[in-house]
Amino acid sequence: MSAVKLEAIVCHEPDESELSHLSDNGSKTKNGVVFQLLDQKSSEHRWFSERFLRWRRRYLPVDGDNRRDHGSVKQSGPLVSGAAYCISSCSMIILNKIVLSSYNFNAGVSLMLYQNLISCLVVAVLDISGVVSVEKFNWKLIRVWMPVNVIFVGMLVSGMYSLKYINVAMVTILKNATNILTGIGEVYMFRKRQNNKVWAAMFMMIISAISGGITDLTFDAVGYTWQLANCFLTASYSLTLRRVMDKAKQSTKSGSLNEVSMVLLNNLLSIPFGIILIILLGEWRYVISTDVTKDSMFWVVATASGFLGLAISFTSMWFLHQTGPTTYSLVGSLNKVPISLAGLVLFNVPLSLPNLFSILFGLFAGVVFARAKMS
């Protein structure tokens, strides 16, 4: 499951614009529902996480003796949950990069399908064991959700291919374009006014992306094209999800749709699309014949990336419950720093001084954007 899922549900890293828009409207909250990979699964992670916080406060109040017990771990809660969220999101991107580049695995759609299958199986097991509750699906709900899922699949696939061709640091910086597209979409679709600080931060993001591309010693036109497509699809997913949510709730018997159900629905509906793409692109021949799939460590890494996709979803919910939208958004922005540095070090990326400054400037622009959206 990509990091842009529940940033998130997979490859997808929630995006600051998504969370801040929802927090601006009081009761409207999110997931990551999960960048994107990171990011890919980023806007969804934050959106779902916000909604989980509302549900938690409403149905699981803390009082009496429970309040005293809760207080004893309150100080360590934010630190532990924040560390878990950062580690899982960083690990997700690094593992996907290892599978696609280090193992030279040329079947991004197949990897996405495998990760989503793992997510479905884990959620199903949790549902059967009574750990979570999943809404019963019907054809009306599936028809309403289908446009969102088509964009979701495109978001994950484009994220996989971009990560194969571009180094992790540049992927992280280019993902800032998602914030720009989402911010513009909010203006035209939801009539949401952006303050001058937000527009200034967006301009900084554009400068960092352009300068980063010009100074990138490993520049790959195919990879950059995939990443720009991913930014467009991630922003579209975030904006479309907001419009579809109310209709989706009305399509269920209970009149509600919790976050876990959304995770399962998105991943379950993506499986037929994944199978069709694998057949059309001929990936199944490659998967059967390549020596990579005969390597047991490859399957260990690929399976771990699938579990990490779900881990991002749940740790983002946990961290948001322990802190709040402001802290969550800032940590999400700052989390790009260790991801970028880890990507540069682990994969021995050729780096020039101008490109390094472009990356650092882009990371700074992301933090400025998060602060501006909350001001």
UniProtKB/Swiss-Prot annotation:
Entry annotated with the keyword Transmembrane helix: yes
Membrane topology field: Multi-pass membrane protein
Main location per the UniProt record: Golgi
Localization (cell): Golgi apparatus membrane
One example GO MF annotation: antiporter activity
Keywords of the record: Antiport, Golgi apparatus, Membrane, Sugar transport, Transmembrane, Transmembrane helix, Transport
BP GO annotations: GDP-mannose transmembrane transport; nucleotide-sugar transmembrane transport
InterPro entries in alphabetical order: Sugar_P_trans_dom, TPT_transporter
Pfam families in the record: TPT
Tissue: Expressed in rosette leaves, stems, flowers and siliques.
Transmembrane segments: 79-99, 112-132, 141-161, 165-185, 199-219, 262-282, 300-320, 327-347, 349-369
Record-level GO cellular component terms: Golgi apparatus; Golgi membrane
Effect of inactivating the gene: No visible phenotype.
Family according to the record: Belongs to the nucleotide-sugar transporter family. GDP-Mannose:GMP antiporter (GMA) (TC 2.A.7.13) subfamily.
Function field: GDP-mannose transporter that may be involved in the import of GDP-mannose from the cytoplasm into the Golgi lumen.
Entry-linked PANTHER family: SOLUTE CARRIER FAMILY 35
Protein name as annotated: GDP-mannose transporter GONST2
Organism: Arabidopsis thaliana (Mouse-ear cress)
